Amino acid sequence: MKKPSQLLAKSYDRKKYQQPPDYALYTQHNRDVAYSCKALAQVVGAVALANAGLDENLIAEFNRTLLANGWIQDLGKANSHFQAMVSGQSEIIQLLRHETISGLLVCLEPRFQEWLAPLGEKVKLIAVWGAIGHHRKFDDNTFPKKVMELKVYTSDDDFKANLKEMAQDLDLAEPPIFESDLTIAPNKDDICDFLAGESLDKIKAEFRKLESVFADEQSRRFVALVKALGIAADGAASGVAKKYKLAENYSLADFVTENLSKGLKPSDLTTLIYSWAWKSRDLKKEEIDLSKLPPGFVFRTFQENVKASESYLTFAQAGCGSGKSIAAYLWAHKWCDKLEKQGRNNLHIFFCLPTTGTTTEHFKDYALESGIPPELISLTHSRSSVDLETMAETAIQEEANEEENDIAKTASAALKAQQDKIEGLALWSTPLIVTTADTVLGLMANARRAIYSTPAIMQSVIVFDEIHAFDDYLFGHLLVFLKNFPRLPVLLMTASLPEQRRLAIEKVRPDLCYVPGDEKLETLPRYHIQYPVNHQNTWDAVEKCIANNGKVLWVRNRVEWANETYTEAKAKFPDISVNVYHSRLRYKDRSDRHRQVIDDFKQKGKAAILVATQVAEMSLDLSADLLITDIAPPPALIQRMGRLNRRATPDNPGEPKPALICSLPAENQVSPYSKEELKTAKTWVEKLKALNQPLNQKDLADKFAEVSDVKEYDYKEAEKRACFFGIPKNSGLWRTRPGSTREQGYTISVILKADYEAWKKQGLSGEPDADWIRKHEVAVPIRQEALKWEQVAGIRIAPNEAIAYNYNEQTREGVGARWL
């Protein structure tokens, strides 16, 4: 293509603008990224180093490295292939990505090497590693494409001006002046300055040699923080510049400082805690006084002990219904007060739970009605409406996999990337964040949204609740996160944890402060366990409970079993409330069902039956009079039993309630669990039965410890998977690719074709926004054919002939989605 009159960094709407707006210009974007890096270093740098346990004297080196990274990131956009791509040829295949070209220039071009030498080899190297990885697409498997040669426009006035400004900002000598452009070619016979493949092999070989310099964890933490904040800076620069269009209308320094200066005050958390305390009283609104606790209200000893912990890592293990959530906010209040006295007024709280269902209900129960201004709180898995609205983009292929040739899929990948960036940046100015654990621990896998959230994460205290529910990948990421951020305040909570995992946490963090539940509550007799029981026994127990206006919770291991039991219960008891609750409901329907179930169980003197799956283990704050459950692994059964007789207290103990544990319909129908897990469960149940007495939470935990696997957790394997920090010769450092946050699941989220068609009839342009997607997505079991369905906003659309959806919008009854 013909060399453009002005070099571009971003594409723009040529119908709207006769000339490129500032945000699209090569010189302006590079300047914006550098300024954003400088501001992030100023605001977040010191606390990030402290969180990682790094020497505070490294701050000057850190700031300089991050700034150099910002200037280097997009140097390589001054090339013919990239300029063609952002000038309308969006389907062009590039010989090398622009960030790879940036790395080649800095590492191999002699004039660049001499000019940048005063930075120091270490600063330059880390800055380059951050730059070539800022799109998470560089590692051992990065190779040139088999296409024509490209020109690097080193003689262009914009390129020269950019180098001159870079020199001034980094306090370097006058930059080299290139009288002609450089050529990068694919073939050995080509006349060129650099052979693409050979040059790429050369820098990768050099990087491999230098990995040994970063063998210690502290060095790898330094590198990872530079890379993450560099990516976040690029996101901020793209978002702010796109919104304000002209450089005179915005300041990256102001944006970063203002957004990251918003934080919670101790008084905000006092309001949240008092609000929750008053909600426990049956009072009229005018009787509530949020300036104080209700008369006679006293926090439990366990809650006070969690608050009193002085360690950076606290582990609260207490039975279901012990008040762990409020203990967490008391703990956060203590840290908020402590950090405010140290001059930090921008504290964030991340309250992390395992699933979207648990986050939604926690958000409703604690944050939404807390009295804290709504602009200071966020439910991240459903939030998408933020001030930036859109990001300045290059072209859709920039975010797609290198091997992806499908235009629709590349467009969808670009939209998903934009959504992740916007949602990540939104958290900078949102101090109270209720979210899934992936939002934070995704950082360990280089997950895009987590990386863009890094500045907020570094300014936070973090609660990880229900950690027993983390799969092996997520728990491994938790361990790596805890080990590498030893001075970031973290609270872990659960009712039970396998001994293997507890020991693994203690090994990576010997400073762990363990807080057990209140002894009186933990030893309060709550359950009568029965195992095994037959079909008739269960229905007899249900009839007896219903006759006394009791509440029945029946938990099945599979959705189809739950639907069968629900149908049978509805037929047997047509005059009482019978509901089914599982993940096959659209998110908006599931949220309605959740609230309906909670309300039904709160009504005194009125019978109710809830049939549920594993969703009952964490997201339901209800108290049943009868529990019926399929045999399941001990942690799952402990959680299910936590919903039985939940309101019992030492002052008002009541009688222990029956828990009926049923054998599986067939011995081979163990899924979603393993035979080994269920064998352990049977041993655990027999040990409990052998006590020959009403059971308490401590009994459940003690006997679980006796049957837990004490084999040491494989931390080295977790470290390999946590590619954010990485280990030499495997991942991290100069390699930057996204990994997996969780193990592969059994379900996939889809949008129903009927819902998508209804959205299109509204005549809206583009694709549905994230809020609409979240409300309408539904999980279905994975089948190979689903992977071939068309997509919208990164979510597959389920054809009407493949998935049936049973739900009545008026009565709000139905069993949800199923394969046809």
Feature map (PLM): residue ranges:
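C-terminal accessory region of SF2 helicases/translocases
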Residues: 2, 8-9, 624, 638-641, ...
